[in-house]
């Protein structure tokens, strides 16, 4: 049991993260009508961002905990595969970068139905981006802690698929029904069935270039992971969770 203590903690942190994100999404319509979209976005970020930072920090500090299931580190093919999958996952994970100024509420945040770009491949790109990311990093790290973390994150995103469709159906009605008919949850399925077409030109936009820059920055920043881990381990948060 002691071997998997940190795995239980990370599952608890994922649960908190999921409640904040999915709960915040469920409350959005009522909250925006009460306090306005900008103030609600700032309130939401003030809770979601710290929860994400704590979750990521704890994961980095304990990623090699538990049982070592396999070890492909040192294998150049696996190394390249992991970085390729990570890059692909970012293209799925961050469709929100299409409206960067809405994130800090510089522009008025607004719920939209996107029917272009990555949405032609799957209408839930963040879920499949997370699945790809989890597969890549579990393959590379190879510990039971990372495997359990990945399972927790994937379960959260599978719930978000159902929850997201339900919220959009309530909010947009017939418009979402038409969108649903022309898209698929499973990547590429709608294209293969002829309900959708792939347009490569829609991927050549400034936001996608920003994602490529982010991937490069992340590659560079991996050398500082140990510094981040030492900082977290010396903080009151590490003592609290221990």
Residue ranges and their predicted role:
Residues 22-25, 56-63, 94-101, 138:
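Transmembrane helix-loop junctions and nearby membrane-interface residues
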Residues 20-40:
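Membrane-interface helix-loop junction between the first two transmembrane segments
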């Amino acid at each position: 049991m002691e071997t998997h203590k940190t795995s239980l903690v990370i599952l608890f942190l994922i649960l908190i993260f999921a409640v904040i994100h999915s709960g915040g999404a469920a409350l959005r319509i009522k909250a925006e009508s009460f306090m306005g979209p900008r103030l609600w976005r700032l309130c939401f970020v003030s809770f979601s961002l710290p929860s994400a930072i704590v979750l990521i920090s704890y994961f980095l500090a304990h990623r090699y905990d538990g049982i070592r299931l396999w070890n492909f580190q040192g294998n150049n093919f696996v190394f390249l595969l992991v970085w390729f999958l990570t890059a692909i996952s970012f293209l799925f994970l961050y469709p929100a970068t299409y409206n960067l100024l809405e994130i800090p509420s510089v522009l008025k945040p607004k719920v939209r139905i996107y029917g272009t770009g990555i949405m032609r491949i799957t209408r839930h790109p963040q879920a499949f981006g997370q699945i790809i990311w989890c597969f890549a990093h579990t393959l590379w790290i190879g510990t039971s802690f990372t495997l359990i973390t990945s399972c927790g994150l994937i379960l959260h995103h599978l719930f978000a698929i159902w929850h997201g469709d339900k919220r959009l159906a309530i909010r947009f009605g017939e418009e979402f029904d038409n969108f649903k008919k022309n898209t698929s949850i499973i990547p590429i399925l709608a294209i293969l069935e002829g309900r959708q077409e792939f347009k490569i030109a829609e991927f050549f936009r400034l936001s996608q270039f920003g994602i490529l820059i982010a991937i490069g920055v992340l590659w560079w920043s991996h050398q500082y992971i140990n510094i981040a881990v030492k900082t977290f381990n010396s903080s009151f948060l590490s003592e609290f969770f221990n």
